[in-house]
């Protein structure tokens, strides 16, 4: 444990700082920023009234106590004066143009309709204000990609008109982009605002962080974690993006700056790592040592001097240019980065940075170097560059090797089976820019099932109950195999089924329970572990308050591992407070293309930055015995058809890019939990992909944690259709947990676990192996500590804090009941995040229940997660969960757990997501306990001394 004490105030301060350090200043002509005290501001853009704290879907569904948006932050600072007349005009317009939150899961619009801004209106505001701030907002998320169209990646006509009129009237204009990931930026050159900032989606303290940068309380130090090209078509992945059945990774390892620095530097509007400051820095570097051998590293020394007039931080990056050799290489690869402390004008800091050779070694999937399936350093000169972005980084040194060096010997894995061609460099011009050539991608030569057959775990025969508990394993009294030998085949099959969503066996409103999900498994001392959606905070669909974090892109743009680690110590404490063992995050897929809807959750186009951000979060959360589940393993590069679109990708691209961030999180971040993705890679769905989950993850990386599926994911036997019932394929691959089923014991999902065990398609030892992975995870969890009575003073203090916190409230209506009462359906606000409270007055005291019929809305996406939590007073009675495919009316009965000993009680209905339809809502008295209650109260009065 560390000395960090859970405090919402300190949590908020740290998040606020992370927001500020993640903001990227793109333009600042005439030093319009920072704002001077007394500035009179005209605030344009309807997004000022609907700040996007995060993207949509499971990654953003956090119930917050508050959200401090940009307008609220500016209004609360007496250094600045907002144009009240303009604000009133917006508020009047908004009465007829309310916020459109969509019809439910994945149906939220990308943007909100913009109020028309005429030149006359702008000129009127100019009479009162001397500076204009324009806010443009965007969102996207799970099951909903961005699109290369107006209102998403491109500006709308109304937004362009607003920019045109405001920028032509005001001499000083500032544009704030409240977005989850990068958007088209051609408009900057056209309308020429004075300043532009990516302020991202900053969670509940987002507006506060923006205020700090605008005011100059924080000097901007964020750097782009992605390359911004002039046009969406300039990204080579765009040509293959968005197909329903297949996503061909023809650009191979040339993603983001790796592509542009090699083939098309002229197409870059803003380079990777770009970001301005209110001050200036002088950066000098030197390569101090370089060992280009297996296990070797490069050490560089970077001197950063503040040569400006303002105190500030600087983020510096180190890149490698490897020789083209036989394989072909990107012109630049990020190998290290660091961030200074706050430097006063004239102050210098020297950063010592190290890069292992694994950061720039190349994987040979062709055998062209004579070392097939190896990471190698080819002979030639290795040049190293340092600076503030990939384009401007200057040469700081070089070293050469005369012969090829093998840095890691591996084996063929996850190879494609479908022939395709990939990009490679051909000839370079006088400026070092290469033309594009194409080559055939090597195809698979080894069947993964042959590897499985030669790598089966030793059989563990069933012994029956020997009296061993899981605690005996911790104490060293028995081995894990001896303990698990007690479990029958049926019990092992129960073990690999997680339950949810909103299982009553764990914290209310969370994503799922796993491990000890049956009475029999709990008899053996196996606790039920709890997982909750992230990564933007803890999602609890019962309405419990949690802290909403800045989005992943914002955090990555800070280039500050230490600060992100500090922030996630608070996340770790909050997880432990809420009895959640693992947060379902961070998301660490790469920003292969700007249109991926979940880019807001993910960090960057670069695997090193991605992996180190993930490692910082994991190490900090794990100080409190909780962790994060890194996801989505792997290649979740688009949301459209994410269950079906086959990622056709080379081994080299997987090894150097798409798996690299996960590898860093495993090796450096000590990851203990991983979520596989929905779709297939090279024809095999990831949830049952043996090469991915066993050959690479466990055998090569040494991973010993759990792997869980995404919710209701599918798996397949190669060449066969995928099914969410094929848990046998999952266990065979070491995907330990199928998430989720309604009831593990009854096999409510009707999976094939027992069937395939009986016919020999999968062996008992493979189920034991997954059960062992699950148990090892649980032995390190707070759930286990609670089960064995080892709660700490920290747990007791966190529990005290939890009891003080309040949940979301909403509209309240009164209802009287004798034997039954109808609930007016118009009372119920079924919108996302809304609750309705019924104050129920009964004629008699007793036990009560609620009955209703429900279904998913007709336009709900099939994988939508639609939840309704029903409370009696402050206690959760039940969470009703529908999938978007549940389109038929279903009767639900919710029994209130506590007998009523007063004549009034409260029923709260909280909707974690919109998209559920209700009808025939009634509350019934299940049993009258009036006479019994009166008798008990009479006895109590008689026994109570006066």
Question: How would you describe each model-predicted region?
Answer:
Residues 863-865:
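Acidic, Ser/Thr/Pro-rich low-complexity intrinsically disordered segments
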Residues 393-409:
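C-terminal tail/sorting-segment detector
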């Amino acid at each position: 444990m560390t000395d960090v004490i859970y405090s919402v105030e300190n949590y908020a301060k740290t998040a606020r700082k992370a927001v500020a350090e993640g903001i990227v200043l793109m333009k600042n002509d005439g030093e319009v920023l920072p704002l001077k005290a007394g500035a009179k501001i005209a605030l344009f853009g309807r997004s000022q009234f609907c700040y996007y704290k995060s993207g949509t879907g499971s990654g953003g569904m956090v119930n917050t106590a508050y959200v401090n948006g940009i307008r609220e932050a500016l209004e609360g600072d007496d250094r600045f004066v907002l144009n009240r007349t303009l604000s009133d005009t917006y508020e009047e317009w908004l009465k007829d143009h309310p916020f459109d939150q969509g019809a439910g899961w994945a149906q939220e619009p990308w943007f909100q309709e913009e109020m028309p801004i005429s030149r006359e209106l702008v000129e009127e505001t100019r009479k009162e204000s001397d500076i204009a701030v324009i806010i443009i907002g965007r969102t996207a998320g799970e099951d909903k990609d961005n699109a290369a169209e107006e209102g998403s990646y491109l500006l709308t006509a109304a937004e362009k008109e607003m920019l045109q009129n405001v920028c032509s009237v005001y001499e000083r204009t500032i544009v704030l982009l409240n977005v989850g990931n990068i958007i088209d930026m051609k408009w900057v050159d056209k309308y020429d605002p004075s300043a532009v900032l990516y302020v991202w989606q900053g969670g509940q303290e987002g507006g506060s962080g923006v205020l700090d940068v605008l005011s100059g309380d924080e000097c901007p130090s964020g750097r782009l974690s992605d390359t911004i090209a002039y046009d969406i078509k300039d990204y080579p992945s765009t040509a293959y993006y968005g197909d329903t059945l297949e996503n061909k990774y023809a650009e191979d390892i040339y993603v983001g700056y790796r592509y542009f620095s090699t083939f098309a530097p002229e197409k870059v509007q803003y380079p990777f790592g770009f970001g301005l400051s209110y001050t200036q820095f002088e950066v000098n570097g030197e390569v101090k040592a370089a060992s280009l051998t297996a296990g070797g590293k490069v050490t560089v020394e970077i001197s950063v001097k503040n040569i400006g007039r303002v105190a500030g931080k600087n983020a510096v990056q180190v890149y490698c240019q490897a020789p083209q050799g036989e394989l072909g290489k990107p012109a630049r690869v990020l190998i290290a980065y660091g961030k200074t402390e706050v430097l006063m004008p004239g102050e210098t800091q020297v950063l010592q940075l190290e890069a292992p050779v694994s950061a720039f070694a190349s994987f040979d999937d062709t055998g062209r170097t004579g070392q097939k399936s190896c990471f190698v350093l080819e002979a030639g000169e290795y040049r190293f560059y340092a600076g503030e972005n990939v384009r401007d980084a200057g040469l700081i040194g070089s070293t050469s090797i005369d012969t090829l060096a093998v840095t890691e010997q591996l084996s063929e894995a996850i190879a494609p089976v479908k022939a395709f061609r990939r990009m490679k460099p051909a000839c370079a011009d006088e400026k070092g820019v290469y033309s594009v050539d194409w080559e055939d991608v090597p195809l698979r030569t080894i069947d993964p099932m042959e590897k499985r057959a030669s790598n089966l775990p030793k059989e563990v025969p069933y012994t029956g109950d020997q009296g061993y508990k899981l605690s005996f394993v911790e104490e060293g009294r028995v081995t894990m195999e001896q303990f698990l030998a007690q479990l029958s085949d049926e019990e092992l099959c129960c073990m690999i089924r997680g339950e949810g969503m909103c299982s009553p066996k764990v914290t209310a409103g969370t994503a799922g329970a796993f491990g000890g999900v049956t009475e029999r498994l709990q008899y053996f001392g196996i606790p039920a572990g709890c997982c909750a959606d992230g990564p933007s905070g803890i999602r609890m669909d019962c309405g419990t308050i949690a802290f909403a974090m800045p989005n992943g892109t914002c955090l990555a743009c800070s280039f500050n591992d230490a600060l992100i680690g500090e922030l996630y110590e608070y996340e770790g404490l909050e997880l432990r407070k809420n009895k959640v063992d693992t947060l379902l995050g961070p998301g660490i897929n790469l920003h292969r293309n700007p249109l991926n809807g979940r880019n807001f959750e993910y960090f960057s186009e670069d695997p090193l930055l991605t992996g180190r951000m993930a490692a910082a979060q994991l190490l900090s959360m794990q100080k409190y015995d909780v962790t994060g589940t890194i996801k989505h393993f792997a290649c979740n590069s688009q949301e459209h058809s994410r269950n079906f679109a086959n990622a056709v990708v080379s081994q080299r691209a997987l090894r150097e890019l798409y798996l690299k961030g996960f590898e860093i999180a495993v090796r450096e971040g000590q990851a203990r939990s991983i979520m596989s993705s929905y779709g297939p890679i090279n024809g095999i769905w990831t949830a049952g992909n043996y090469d991915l989950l066993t050959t690479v993850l466990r055998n090569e990386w040494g991973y010993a944690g759990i792997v869980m599926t995404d919710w209701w994911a599918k798996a397949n036997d190669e060449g066969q259709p995928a099914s969410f019932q094929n848990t046998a394929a999952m266990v065979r691959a070491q995907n330990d947990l199928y998430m989720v089923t309604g009831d593990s014991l009854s096999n409510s999902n009707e999976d094939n676990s027992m069937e395939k065990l009986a016919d020999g398609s999968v062996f008992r030892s493979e189920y034991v192996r997954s059960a062992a992975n699950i148990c090892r995870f649980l032995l390190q969890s707070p759930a286990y500590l609670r089960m064995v009575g080892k709660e700490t003073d920290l747990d007791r203090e966190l529990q005290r804090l939890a009891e003080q916190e309040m949940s979301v409230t909403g509209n309240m209506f009164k209802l009287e009941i004798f034997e039954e009462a109808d609930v007016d359906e118009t009372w119920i606000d079924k919108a996302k995040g809304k609750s309705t409270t019924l104050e129920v007055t009964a004629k008699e005291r007793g036990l009560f229940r609620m009955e209703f019929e429900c279904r998913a809305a007709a336009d709900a996406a099939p994988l939508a997660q639609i939840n309704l939590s029903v409370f009696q007073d402050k206690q959760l009675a039940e969470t009703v969960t529908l999938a978007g495919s549940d389109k038929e009316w279903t009767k639900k009965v919710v029994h209130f757990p506590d007998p009523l000993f007063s004549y009034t009680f409260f029923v709260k209905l909280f909707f974690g997501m919109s998209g559920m339809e209700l009808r025939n809502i009634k509350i019934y008295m299940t049993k009258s306990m009036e006479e019994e209650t009166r008798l008990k109260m009479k006895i109590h009065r008689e026994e109570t001394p006066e």
